[in-house]
Amino acid sequence: YGYYKSKEELFEAIVGEHYEYIRNRFIKAQQEFAELPAAQQPEVMSDISGICMYDILYYAYEHLEECKLILCCSEGTKFAGLIDEMVEIEVDGTHAYQDVLRQLGRPSPHIDPSLEHILITGMFHTFFELIIHEMPLKDAENYVREMRAFYTAGWMKIMGQ
């Protein structure tokens, strides 16, 4: 690692700001959504998450090498946990949204926590595959649109909406 005491320090120097951007952009979208009036949330859920996904996609393509290092080479550092962190944030957001649906008189059936974790993890892995495999940006944009339609329909079905 030369100038750095550890892989962790090296990765902090190379990818730290990019990891923080992706993580913080996702958190910001979750917070913006949670701060909306309850009645408005079902109407704009897909819009806010879509904007966030495209923002992260474009950012990752602008910083492709660094983002690929996070996704493919960060084992043994805190950066390897990016997807797991995003999954936990999404799980919490899903539970908060279920509370909103209950408040609106549109309760969601119980979702098995293991299934919920598997589906959300799969969703993020699917998204990040676009970056890992360096899909042409136009293709990646189309794939994100299709993935959003697929996952939105699935979640709406599971949530009884």
Model regions and ranges:
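Short helix-coil transition/hinge motifs at the ends and kinks of transmembrane helices
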Residues: A34-V44, Q103-P107
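Hydrophobic/aromatic-rich alpha-helical bundle segments in the mid-to-C-terminal region
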Residues: Y97-F150, M159
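Amphipathic alpha-helical packing segments from all-alpha helical-bundle domains
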Residues: I51-E62, G76-Q103, P113-T121
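C-terminal/domain-terminus segments
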Residues: I70-V87, D139-W155
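Amphipathic alpha-helical segments that line or abut small-molecule/effector binding pockets
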Residues: Y19, E43-E65, T121, H125, ...
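Amphipathic alpha-helical segments used for helix-helix packing
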Residues: A34, A38, L57-T77
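Alpha-helical structural segments
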Residues: G2-K5, E9-E35, D47, I51-D55, ...
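Solvent-exposed, amphipathic alpha-helical segments
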Residues: Y21-E32, E66, G122-L130
